[in-house]
Amino acid sequence: MKIDLAPHEEFEKEVAGRFGILPNFFRSSQAAPELIQQLWGFANAGYLDNPMPSIFKERLFVWLSRFCPMRYCIVRHIGFLLGGNHGRAAGDSAAVPQSIEEVVRLLRRPSPWQREMEPMYVLLERLTATLEAWPHADSELEDAMFACAAVLFVEPARSERAKDALIHALGARRFEFFSGCLAFIRTAHYWTMLHPEIQTEDDMHVLMRGHEELARLMLDDSEADR
């Protein structure tokens, strides 16, 4: 016999079915639950159903979440990258989980404001053709694209060269999917700033207690106030 659920219960069931867990992000806005359901629609368009590879999207989400003063997003999305009982990368049950070591390397990368950006721009600008595939995790191309993405994300009014380099590497159509993902990540960050009551889930507290270096990189980042 089919059990009828209230609309919001149906919504939470849908979210949990996609991520493998129910993130507290999608349990916020209790006073206007219909609003968070609309935000879920944007999450699907810009992030979950975006045709970029799942691990690439999730690593991009984690990387850009370094620059958000609220720590909820970086912690939760690292959980998604790690998989298992922490959820699924970009809601993809087929995504291969990353290791703690891979995540730590990502978090240790210098930001654009801690490095010389010229080589990053040149690497993308000198490509002789649009990339046929999205970069592999931990590759030089991913590093360059993420560095340019950070400039575009944090300083959009001063990011013309970064944007042009990304368009050159990706082509116009894939750049739009890339920028759509950035737009949702920005929205998610702003939402957590407006809802500081959103708490990190228990699974991530347990993980951080067992991995002190990872916890430090997540919670104590000098780039968080960008």
Predicted region positions:
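Hydrophobic alpha-helical segments
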Residues: 1-226
